[in-house]
Amino acid sequence: MIAFASSLDQGGILAKNIKDAAIALQCISGYDSKDATSIKAEVPNFSEDCESSEFEHVVGLVTDLIHSFGDEDLSKNYGEAIERLEKLKIKTKEIELPNLELSLPVYYVIAPAECSANLSRYDGIRFGYRAENVENLEDLYFKSRGEGFGKETKKRILIGTYCLSSGFYDAYYKKAQKIRNLISSDFVNAFKDVTSVMLPTTSGEAFDLGSITDPVEMYKQDIFTIPANLGGLPATSVPFGEKNNMPLGIQFIGNILEESSLLNISNKFQLGEK
């Protein structure tokens, strides 16, 4: 694993089902004295908790927000997900996340800024790819980073360096951090009444490779998954529904250190049984 945006990064598990994800989470959780991001807390038995019948759930819904995007397929799939919760006799409650739509611009200021700092270590000397046939030290830096980083990575480094540069720090990075706090506060308030929040995973189905050339259009697919990273919250995504023969997904966001409850509701939803 390579640090990209330290305040946003979290390890993700790809699994066939929630139970397998719970088992994997059990293995990677816990305190590590060499990992500054780990905490000294007892690790629950996630694999047992995800199948437990002892959890009481109240799922937060943002139906009006989903409808505001004007995508009928998105609204329809979200509505069908709500119907599944009702069939499972799981309580739901409409909540407000007034700043959620600001997640995208906030993320694309904070993430590149932290990325530009984290990836500065990859200079071809101690870390990362080292170019050959160089004339001097400056040429080594230039060629190693030029050849070693991909186009998207270079783009984000440039954006991040710009946001952190003199005269722009307050206008962009500092302001983005303030809005991030508002987004986090929205979730803190929501979790006073609910145990998890249900959102679509993406705003649409996966697009064909090369079919979208505008990077902003591709970035928009992240609008529902970014809030969890901004708030430092655990989240899961399970397959649900389809569009144009491509799978769609439903996401559950849990409260801080409430992975057991999150895995439990996600498992119930995925199984679709009482």
PLM feature spans:
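Structural helix-boundary/capping segments
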Residues: 1-69, 79-91, 158-185, 230-274
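Short glycine/serine-rich loop/turn segments
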Residues: 1-11, 64, 113, 199-216
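Short glycine-/acidic-enriched loop or helix-start segments at secondary-structure transitions
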Residues: 70-71, 104, 169, 207-210, ...
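Short connector loops at secondary-structure junctions
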Residues: 88-107, 203, 242
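Serine-dependent amide/ester hydrolase catalytic core
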Residues: 100, 123-230
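Short, hydrophobic/amphipathic alpha-helical patches that form generic packing surfaces
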Residues: 105-114, 156-164
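Short low-complexity, flexible loop/linker segments enriched in glycine and/or proline
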Residues: 106-112, 214-215, 251-253
